[in-house]
Amino acid sequence: MTGWLIDMVSVGQRKPFLLQPFRGATRHLRRVSVGGLRRLQYTSLLLTRSYWGLMYAFNWWDIIDEHFVLGGAMMFDDLDRLQGLGVDAVLNLCAERSDNRHQLDNAGIAYLWLPVIDVCPPTLDQIMQGIGWIEQQLRANRTIYIHCAVGVGRSATLLACWLLYAKRMNVAQALRFLKTRRPQVGLTRLQVRRLEEFEGWLRTGRDNGIARVAGH
């Protein structure tokens, strides 16, 4: 018992032996906490998915056009089903969870993770990186699944930014277009404001940064 309370002398240095089990316990608690949080997030997504499907007949994802599918976080056999739609690239905007990179690599799926906190917009740098990556995938003739947790805010914001950039839509046109394809799209005020900022930024002709990322 006293061995836990005294300092041990090793190679001329005094090391508090009591810290060793404490550090081990801290690491264990951290692993348990992260695992519990992931299970809670998964349960929350499952409930949201079930609620939308039963109450509103909303889809977990919707085909936007021949290049894009917009939706929520992947669960169950979603990857197989999305591949059946021709999806071979995934862009994830969830800060709270990454996708299974090992599974995606094995399936030959191109992947980009841009972590954005829920209800917040992506940063300008993330928008530039995301659009540049999208342009690369389109040149490779890939179909892209863009998602966040439930596919209504963060992912829709980035796809709307691409519509502003590539299709020269304005903010109202981009949001109206997305809503016709996916009715539950609903951006927060912060996300709409970022769209407006990006639209103004494009008007200044500073989109050459995106071209550099895209490799044009």
Question: What name fits each language-model region?
Answer:
Residues 1-53, 212-216:
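Non-catalytic regulatory/accessory regions that flank a structured catalytic core
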Residues 13, 22, 29-30, 141, ...:
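Short, intrinsically disordered low-complexity segments
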Residues 54-144, 164-197, 203:
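Cysteine-based protein phosphatase catalytic domain of the PTP/DSP
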Residues 141-160:
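A phosphate-binding catalytic loop at a beta-strand-loop-alpha-helix junction
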Residues 200-216:
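C-terminal domain-closing interface element
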